[in-house]
Curated annotation (Swiss-Prot):
EC number: 6.1.1.20
Known cofactor(s): Mg(2+)
Subunit comment: Tetramer of two alpha and two beta subunits.
MF-aspect GO terms: ATP binding; magnesium ion binding; phenylalanine-tRNA ligase activity; tRNA binding
Source domain of life: Bacteria
Keywords: Aminoacyl-tRNA synthetase, ATP-binding, Cytoplasm, Ligase, Magnesium, Metal-binding, Nucleotide-binding, Protein biosynthesis
Protein name listed in UniProt: Phenylalanine--tRNA ligase alpha subunit
Subcellular location field: Cytoplasm
Amino-acid positions noted as binding Mg(2+) in the UniProt annotation, renumbered to this chain: 260
Source species of the chain: Sinorhizobium fredii (strain NBRC 101917 / NGR234)
Amino acid sequence: MSELETLERTLLADIDAAADEGAIEALRVGALGKKGSISELLKTLGTMSPEERQTRGARINALKNIVTEAISARKLALKDAAIAERLARETVDISLPVRSSPAERGRIHPISQIVDEITAIFGDMGFSIAEGPDIETDYYNFTALNFPEGHPAREMHDTFFFQPDENGERKVLRTHTSPVQIRTMEAEKPPIRIIIPGKTYRQDSDATHSPMFHQVEGLVIDKTANVANMRWVLEEFCKAFFEVDQVTMRFRPSFFPFTEPSFEVDIQCDRSGPIVKFGEGKDWMEILGCGMVHPNVLRAGGLDPDEYQGFAWGMGLDRIAMLKYGMPDLRDFFNADVRWMTHYGFRPLDMPTLFGGLSA
């Protein structure tokens, strides 16, 4: 075995046995430093003949490259090993159960909880969720919903208008979630069964009104939808939402531009105590509006009212949350008060289901 082969084996064995970066650095200096073993061999190239320099010089340079690569590889291996050891030392078992303790501060806002509850109920009936933009055109917010220009019903909405654009058109903060009905009819073919939860905006603010509030509405479109179907859907919803076995409802004639006939729906309840109890008592409370979709709205959605018909309903999420969970002031929903959230909020992992209980 030649001198260079012996030196190569010795250096590679020492490098492989190095336990830390300090040992690796000492080996590098001993082999490749100014007075290292390989550096000393390179100094002898000047005393060699051209033929010897061509053969032996090439072998010395090859040895230098091999040792340099081995040192770099060992440094990288030691660094990877150190990272792996640290990761193992600092591992957190994410499979541990959530501990119920005073440190558990996060709560689900009641509005988010109500949306999840309503989604669970209507999802069980075969409805899907639809969404749309908060900033709407005048067409989708009013005209397509049978509010023509100058219609007196437009005065019922204290609307937030944006400045006119270059074409003179003013966009609005939507005053209801109904524009999504038109957008859905334009994009999908019947049968349609959707609910539309979302934010809406009107210029109003007191204990029971807010400039920004939440609504949910539903829409059913097919060839045979009728008032009896609508009544059944709403009764089943109220029983599930208020978690009672039976509800008594009354439908009062009303007026909405986008439905005909239109109804306001009251539910029987007991208001004699501090908490409203549903499914019993002799009192009545209005909870939503509904009706059969107006033929003009169907036409605006691209459907033939001689072939299709449907029904729709809408209710305020904030209002039904207040009724169900006994919250006295709507403005508290938006105050970001941690104490209020601790009292009225919900545990993050308690997802509402019909099987497990909506508000358990």
